[in-house]
Design a protein with these regions (language model features):
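Disordered, charged N-terminal biogenesis/targeting segments of membrane/secreted proteins
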Residues: 1-29
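Single-pass transmembrane signal-anchor helices and their membrane-water interface zones
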Residues: 10, 35-60
């Protein structure tokens, strides 16, 4: 099974099942969270579940998608090396990564013993570069011998199961310092492939969206679980709540003025935003509801 097969295979899995599984799994204890918060850091780049895993750089014959993840931990964030055209285009990059996209050299890398990478002080034939067309922390370029990859941001490092990160920090990953750095906001289907409705490009609406989202309070996983699911009387009722919450998921694509794209989710019936790579949740207030009703419904 090559990396393209893995991509197609995961896209054929029912997204509702994956979303429900993820919502429930976030209530597990710390060791499970720390393991999968890193390993599964980008699956939301392929299918619509909340924990981020890419698995887009696996060797042929590799039957285990976990071992096919070309992950990199860098500056307190998790990334994955990607070369599948459909995925690159989904995130606003050209369908093929080439040498001319490599900017300033940042690090030499080495294999981490699997499909992933780690930084090294020694000179190697694997290098990490800035992405020249749009210098930011959301995208880097990786050269592994003669092969070039995009290295896409997946999520912030999680110190424990209640680590929380503000949306301001997610925006900064893509060099968004104000609403002027956002080109459009678009609702997408669960696979993040088809636009739903018309992209929001009105400057006033984008300014309001940015201002409201950076002001929202951030909840780590443990606090979110308590707020959302602790009031149910038994396990069966709680499981039904998890399913209903997952079924309510909708996706927003944010595109920067440089053309880079990333995604966050929202659950309007339950008043929550799923902060994507922040691995955090945000309570939707009345103003945010009004913006959603005005622009996305």
């Amino acid at each position: 099974m090559n990396r393209k097969d893995l991509y197609n295979g995961f896209n054929e899995v029912d997204d509702d099942i994956l979303e429900r599984s993820e919502t429930a799994s976030r209530s597990k204890k710390k060791p499970v969270w720390l393991k999968w918060g890193a390993i599964a850091a980008c699956l939301c780049l392929v299918v619509s579940i909340a924990i981020p895993v890419l698995h887009h750089k696996g060797g042929s014959g590799n039957q285990d998608p976990v071992h096919a993840i070309a992950a990199l931990e860098y500056n307190g964030k998790f990334y994955e090396a990607v070369d599948i055209p459909e995925v690159l285009e989904k995130y606003g990059l050209p369908s093929k990564i080439t040498a001319d996209m490599a900017g300033e050299h940042l690090e030499y890398l080495k294999s981490d013993g699997g499909a992933g990478y780690e930084c090294t002080a020694s000179q190697t034939d694997i290098e990490l570069y800035q992405y020249a067309p749009s210098v930011c922390e959301g995208v880097y370029i990786l050269r592994d011998g003669e092969v070039w990859y995009a290295v896409l941001f997946c999520n912030f490092y999680q110190f424990d199961s209640n680590t929380n990160v503000e949306l301001t920090e997610l925006y900064r990953v893509y060099s968004i310092e104000s609403a002027d750095d956002i080109a459009s906001i678009t609702e997408m289907d669960r696979n993040r492939e088809k636009e739903i409705g018309t992209p929001v490009t009105d400057r006033q609406e984008i300014t309001e969206f940015y201002g409201m989202t950076v002001a929202l309070w951030s909840y780590g996983n443990d606090d979110f679980q308590k707020q959302m699911f602790s009031g149910y009387p038994d396990e069966e009722a709680q499981q039904k709540a998890h399913i209903a919450f997952a079924d309510d998921y909708r996706c927003i694509r944010i595109e920067t003025v440089d053309g880079l794209r990333f995604f966050i989710g929202f659950h309007p019936s339950f008043d929550w935003i799923d902060g994507g790579g922040t691995m955090s949740y945000f309570k939707i207030d009345e103003q945010m509801h009004a913006w959603i009703d005005r622009n996305l419904n």
